Amino acid sequence: MGKVIGIDLGTTNSAMAVYEGNEAKIIANKEGKNTTPSIVAFTDKGEILVGESAKRQAVTNPEKTIYSIKRIMGLMFNEEKAKEAEKRLPYKIVDRNGACAIEISGKVYTPQEISAKILMKLKEDAESYLGESVTEAVITVPAYFNDSQRKATKEAGTIAGLNVLRIINEPTSAALAYGLDKKESEKIMVYDLGGGTFDVTVLETGDNVVEVLATGGDAFLGGDDFDNRVIDFLATEFKNETGIEIKNDVMALQRLKEAAENAKKELSSAMETEINLPFITADATGPKHLVKKLTRAKFESLTEDLIEETISKIEGVIKDAGLTKNEISEVVMVGGSTRIPKVQERVKGFINKELNKSVNPDEVVAVGASIQGGVLKGDVKDVLLLDVTPLSLGIETLGGVMTKVIDRGTTIPAKKSQVFSTAEDNQPAVSIMVLQGERDLARDNKSLGKFDLQGIAPAPRGVPQIEVTFDIDANGILTVSAQDKNTGKSQEIKISGSSGLSDSEIEKMVKDAELHKEEDARKKEVIEARNHADSLAHQTQKSLDEHKANLNENDANEIQNAINALKDCIKNDNATKAELEDKTKALVQAAQKLGEAMANKNNAEQPKKKDDDVIDAEVE
């Protein structure tokens, strides 16, 4: 078993770490950074950019630059959250088998495929850093991710060529990273406010056991939402001043997004910042510029309800854990958005305790995941994680009621069964609708899947005994089975979530990812060959223009023809690496005569050296 890497696949940024030499270490990417932007871009030349390179070109290529893909991971297209995401994101969200996907230049990609490209970049960078192949990983997800979102995350890892040993909750991972498993028995609260999600988890630690008592949160609340408040404010102010609706312009919207994110970061240390976006748009009267001062007080008023929503979640989770605020020993702050001063102030004020900020909030989750990797590999001894299911699981029963089989807060892995019966006389089959959520009516909860149990023996209603079993593994992924206890007939469904991906589709995506990897490498070679050719053509043309007088006409024409041929090849987008190299080689050979002419000219211009021993004088 090789090294297992821990990956925090974030909404805004991702990070990775490895456990070696009895300690967890953050792995820097090829750019030397400890975090990688969770951004994928498709260029007009067919390149796929990931991370910093994708982020740098976002303003000029907004419709083909994919960020915050985690926000639609595992979402059904008709869900309200999908509609909200569609309004906010510049790229096109489409319906694929009922699930959210995106469309780029007429091609449809699932969130799993986009996430896989981020994971492939992390995998390759980890291999470069470690000097060995990486095939296994522990990937973290928000504690409040439902079954569909967890399954989709695991599928992304598979497509990227990773064997995902475990999906673990981010707050639990953070608790491991802080070394809380080594402390005396304490009640710990982890407050995790990331780029797109919010989790709050209460854990009990002690004797090398980390046990989750309760968890809650919002899979659609994070730093992006703080940015969006600033974007809305700036757009409204701009419209009031100019009458122009700037949010309809995707390029302007991307510039607004970057400016809002930067302003948010600056206001963590400054009381005021200026947003200056020249030439943001134009109308009949000419170009328009956006210049606006934003104070920390204004930013706090724009985002106050978001912060209060997190405080409300804290209250609920502490109550679910059967505790009071006073029983919380320590508060651990995780996620980049916890740097916002008002967030720290409100959490500290509510719990009435100093906050633990001893580890980088952007890296702590990946570090914890690597420790869990060490546990699974056997390098870390005597650490036990007892996580819980964030939402109740059950089935739809007579009258459209949600009947719970596994309650939220149940320690996983878990397996529970309940016996149900038929609703009508001589009913030959039952449909099992699997649900996740806390609402009393089935329609108000999330449907995870449906299957039928056929061949029930004729009997009056209420007589057949149908045993339904829910089995959740350590990743929080669910399998449901139903058995007619009279006939022994059974049916099982492994919940694939709303990702809509079959095993064969995932396998195809794995192969496609490998294929693209080779294609990308070939495209990079062509680009490098084109760049080299362009540089040579430019330099040779410049030298030819300067030294043409020192060449005979035939040689000069031969060199010019070789330059023109190379330039034509460079302009041809379909030119292969071999064609570019052949034309480059031809120019190098033709230009040898130019080099000789330049050398001869230099020699001719060298001043004749006088012999110091010779005296110019008459001799008698």
UniProtKB/Swiss-Prot annotation:
Transmembrane segments: none annotated. This is Chaperone protein DnaK. InterPro entries: ATPase_NBD, Chaperone_DnaK, Heat_shock_70_CS, HSP70_C_sf, HSP70_peptide-bd_sf, Hsp_70_fam. HAMAP family: DnaK. Pfam families: HSP70 (PF00012). Keywords: ATP-binding, Chaperone, Nucleotide-binding, Phosphoprotein, Stress response. It comes from the Bacteria. Induction: By stress conditions e.g. heat shock. CDD domains: ASKHA_NBD_HSP70_DnaK-like. Acts as a chaperone. The keyword Aminoacyl-tRNA synthetase does not apply. Residues 597-620 are annotated as: Disordered. PROSITE patterns: HSP70_1, HSP70_2, HSP70_3. Gene3D superfamilies: 1.20.1270.10, 3.30.420.40, Actin, Chain A, domain 4, Substrate Binding Domain Of DNAk, Chain A, domain 1. Belongs to the heat shock protein 70 family.
